[in-house]
UniProtKB/Swiss-Prot annotation:
This is Pycsar effector protein EcPycTM. Coiled coil: none annotated. T5 phage that escape Pycsar have mutated major capsid protein pb8 (D20, AC Q6QGD8); infection with these phage elicits less cCMP production. Ectopic expression of the capsid protein in addition to both Pycsar genes does not induce effector-mediated toxicity, suggesting another factor is necessary. GO terms for cellular component: plasma membrane. It is found in: Cell inner membrane. It comes from Escherichia coli. One of its GO terms (biological process) is defense response to virus. The chain crosses the membrane at residues 32-52, 63-83, 141-161. The keyword Cell inner membrane applies. Disulfide bonds: none annotated. The keyword Cell inner membrane applies. GO terms for molecular function: nucleotide binding.
């Protein structure tokens, strides 16, 4: 009866590992898409910056605000790119501090450290069901820590690009106000 319980628990842990790995993959894809959005935003803005430079008859205060907004947009896009890259690039430093085991039958890092497939097979056969369950629980924990870290970086990257778009909206409003002032005069 105990063996059946372990098999169900192992199956559940396998499902948890697959789900968490799916979250990690999805976050990587979203971060890559956000990098593309950042690149497109920076390209479009750099090509259209001239349309905003001479507004309000080159008023000194407007020019200061204009350059301040451009600086802020650049910083916000840079921070979004940086955090998107941090979200994509694997970082196991924080996880290794929480987990010291160097002998896993589930982790690709430790599977690849075997001499060959036969060596891994022998090692795998020697593992008890309790040991396999413990190994899978440790892998679930590690993947969950990685997924959480990726989510935090991605969420932060999104908040930075939102700030950049808020500044861009302010520039567009300035352009609209200048257009209305010119049309009414």
């Amino acid at each position: 009866m105990e063996i059946e319980k372990n098999k169900e628990k192992i199956k559940l842990q396998f499902d948890i590992i697959k789900r968490t790995d799916g979250y990690i993959s999805t976050t990587n894809n979203k971060a890559a898409l956000l990098l593309a959005v950042n690149g497109a935003t920076a390209t479009i803005l750099s090509n259209k910056v001239g349309y905003f430079a001479g507004l309000f008859h080159e008023n000194c205060l407007y020019m200061v605000i204009f350059f301040l907004l451009l600086f802020m947009i650049s910083i916000f896009i840079f921070m979004s790119v940086l955090l998107s890259l941090k979200s994509i690039i694997p970082n196991m430093r924080g996880v290794k501090e929480k987990w010291d085991s160097t002998d896993s039958n589930v982790s690709f890092v430790y599977i690849s450290s075997n001499n060959d497939g036969k060596n891994y097979y022998k090692k795998y056969l020697m593992e008890s069901e309790d040991g396999l369950l413990l190994d899978m629980c440790e892998q679930s924990f590690i993947l969950s820590c990685i997924a959480k870290q990726k989510f935090l970086f991605f969420s932060s990257a999104v908040s930075w690009i939102k700030r950049a778009y808020a500044c861009i909206i302010v520039l567009v409003i300035f352009k609209f106000v200048d257009y209305v002032n010119g049309a009414l005069l």
